[in-house]
């Protein structure tokens, strides 16, 4: 448990050698763009990614906007989510996981650019496409979190939007595990 005033951060609990010992093909790391601890996290994953690359291990980065510089609506705003995906790509991720975004634009400066350049964010597929573009124009694998448990139709709609937008997959853990086994398997 941490206080509400503590910066959003993650603890490193294992290293690259631990991943190799366990037979893992990749290391994983969560960053929180927008957190006061963000730069520290970027430095930590940069060092771990370099070590992993030297040892032939891929890197997965969960890039979830949150923290002191991000509003609650901003955590899923398209400008913030696309930038978070881009940050993960810049940090060397082979695989990037981000949240599906809304059409909300958190940053006033970004709103002007999106409007002036006519960047399409009207549909979920368009927003996925924008996040893929932000991840080195599709030269990184980008998967999207499934979010809170929801109805089957909503899960399928998200999966179709990810497919249509050029994303590489949807992680639907809660949408599977919070159902009965027969329901989850049928889905």
Across the structure, where does each feature detected by a protein language model lie?
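Short Gly/Pro-enriched loop/turn and capping motifs at secondary-structure junctions
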Residues: 103, 147-152, 176-178
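C-terminal helical cap(s) of enzyme catalytic domains, especially alpha/beta-barrels
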Residues: 163-166, 177-187
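Residues in flexible loops and secondary-structure boundaries
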Residues: 106, 150, 184-185
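Alpha/beta enzyme core
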Residues: 1-142, 153-169
């Amino acid at each position: 448990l941490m206080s509400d005033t503590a910066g959003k951060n993650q603890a490193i609990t294992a290293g690259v050698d631990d991943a190799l010992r366990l037979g893992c093909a990749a290391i994983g790391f969560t960053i929180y763009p927008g957190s006061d601890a963000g730069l520290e996290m970027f430095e930590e994953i940069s060092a771990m990614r370099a070590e992993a690359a030297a040892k032939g291990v891929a890197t997965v980065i969960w890039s979830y906007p949150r923290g002191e510089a991000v509003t609650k609506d901003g955590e899923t705003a398209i400008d913030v989510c696309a930038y978070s995906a881009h940050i993960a790509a810049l940090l060397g991720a082979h695989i990037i996981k981000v949240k599906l975004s809304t059409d909300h634009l958190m940053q006033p400066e970004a709103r002007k650019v999106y409007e002036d350049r006519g960047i399409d964010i009207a549909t979920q597929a368009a927003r996925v496409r924008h996040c893929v573009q932000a991840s080195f124009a599709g030269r990184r694998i980008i998967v999207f979190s499934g979010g809170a448990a929801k109805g089957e139709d909503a899960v399928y709609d998200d999966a179709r939007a990810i497919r249509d937008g050029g994303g590489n997959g949807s992680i639907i853990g809660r949408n599977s595990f919070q159902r009965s086994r027969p329901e989850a398997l049928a889905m």
